[in-house]
């Protein structure tokens, strides 16, 4: 009897790991598609450029971007606040490091699941939907990035919290 319970318990534990792995795969397919970047409407531009002043600046620096603040703090870009507009430029070090991409802007990596924390069980309806709580971190961070300069960027030094709904399809779990 003890052996049966032990085998059944091990099977349940392994089933949970598989589900966790499936959730991680589905979330990574969604959040890992694009790089984590500071971008403009038209990235194919020459520097320095004038930027409109943000109406609300969540950073308090005038940039309204913690990613841009990291590039400025590391000395790869320059940012000057003006009366009616701001000016953004790239330093010689930034040019050498190729910090600006004409397709994506200035990127610091891409997001990937760090840990699946918990999930809801699918309901009894026609569609199986779960809410997954997880943490993510930045991966594929360029080697020339000083992580201290980018300490305010979520996921750079510490995992960031997030949640996502996943739907069970005939091809496995998918993010909506």
What are these regions (language model features)?
Residues 25-46:
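Post-signal peptide N-terminal segment of mature Sec-exported envelope proteins
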Residues 14-16:
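C-terminal motif of bacterial Sec signal peptides marking the signal peptidase cleavage site
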Residues 135-156:
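Short, cysteine-centered beta-strand-loop-beta hairpins and adjacent loop/turn segments enriched
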Residues 1-4:
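Positively charged n-region of N-terminal signal peptides that target proteins for export
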Residues 68, 74-113, 119:
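Accessory beta->alpha helical hairpin/"wing" motif in late/C-terminal subdomains of nucleic-acid enzymes
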Residues 131-136, 155-176:
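Short beta-strand edge/turn micro-motifs at domain boundaries
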Residues 18-24:
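Bacterial lipoprotein signal-peptidase II cleavage site
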Residues 53-74, 107-111, 136, 158-159:
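Short amphipathic alpha-helical interaction segments
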């Amino acid at each position: 009897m003890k052996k049966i319970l032990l085998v059944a318990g091990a099977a349940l534990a392994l089933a949970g790991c598989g589900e966790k792995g499936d959730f991680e795969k589905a979330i990574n397919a969604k959040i890992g598609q694009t790089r984590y970047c500071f971008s403009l409407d038209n990235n194919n531009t020459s520097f320095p450029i004038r930027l409109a002043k943000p109406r609300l600046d969540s950073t308090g620096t005038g940039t309204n971007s913690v990613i841009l603040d990291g590039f400025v703090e590391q000395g790869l870009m320059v940012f000057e606040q003006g009366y009616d507009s701001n000016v953004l430029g790239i330093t010689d070090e930034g040019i050498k490091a190729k910090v600006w991409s004409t397709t994506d802007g200035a990127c610091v990596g891409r997001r990937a699941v760090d840990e699946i924390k918990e999930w809801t069980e699918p309901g009894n309806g026609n569609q199986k939907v779960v809410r997954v709580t997880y943490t993510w971190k930045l991966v594929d961070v360029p080697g020339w990035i000083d992580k201290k300069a980018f300490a305010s960027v979520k996921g750079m030094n510490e995992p960031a919290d997030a949640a996502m709904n996943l739907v069970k399809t005939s091809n496995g779990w998918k993010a909506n």
